Amino acid sequence: MAKTLGLHIIADLYGVNPDLIDREEDIRHLLENSVKAGELTKISSHFYQFNPHGATGVILLAESHISIHTWPEHKTATVDVFTCGDPSKAYRAMDYIINSLSPTHVDKKVFDRGIIEDSKGKDVLWIMSKAGCC
């Protein structure tokens, strides 16, 4: 049986209120609160305001990352949540973002990342846990 090193959730959010995704400050607040909702560990972050519309941002996590890119003129945001360790943390972070933005339609995909063999997986996961990742 194989194990995985992480869970990657990607989502395209359509029909989002443009006022919620136009400003860098709002995107920053949204992602930082999603980190808290997922009980994840923030290492650093970077955000950027586009002109005339939209913003992008990423939070580097001890567990991996959360990112968003927005197109308010199309009422659309794309979101990535990738974590190692407890998969429920990734789901909680993504659910927070989706619930906060209240899109009319969500196209969400979930991927297992870093599939490893059981015999090797125990060693790799143990090393990663000692490094504080998972």
UniProtKB/Swiss-Prot annotation:
Pfam family membership, one: AdoMet_dc
Chain ranges passing through the membrane: none
List of residues that carry Pyruvic acid (Ser): S64
Active site: S64, H69, C84
Recorded metabolic or biological pathway in which this protein acts: Amine and polyamine biosynthesis; S-adenosylmethioninamine biosynthesis; S-adenosylmethioninamine from S-adenosyl-L-methionine: step 1/1
Domain of life: Bacteria
Modifications after synthesis and translation: Is synthesized initially as an inactive proenzyme. Formation of the active enzyme involves a self-maturation process in which the active site pyruvoyl group is generated from an internal serine residue via an autocatalytic post-translational modification. Two non-identical subunits are generated from the proenzyme in this reaction, and the pyruvate is formed at the N-terminus of the alpha chain, which is derived from the carboxyl end of the proenzyme.
Reactions accelerated catalytically: S-adenosyl-L-methionine + H(+) = S-adenosyl 3-(methylsulfanyl)propylamine + CO2
Family: Belongs to the prokaryotic AdoMetDC family. Type 1 subfamily.
Protein name per the record: S-adenosylmethionine decarboxylase proenzyme
Organism: Hydrogenobaculum sp. (strain Y04AAS1)
Species lineage: Bacteria, Pseudomonadati, Aquificota, Aquificia, Aquificales
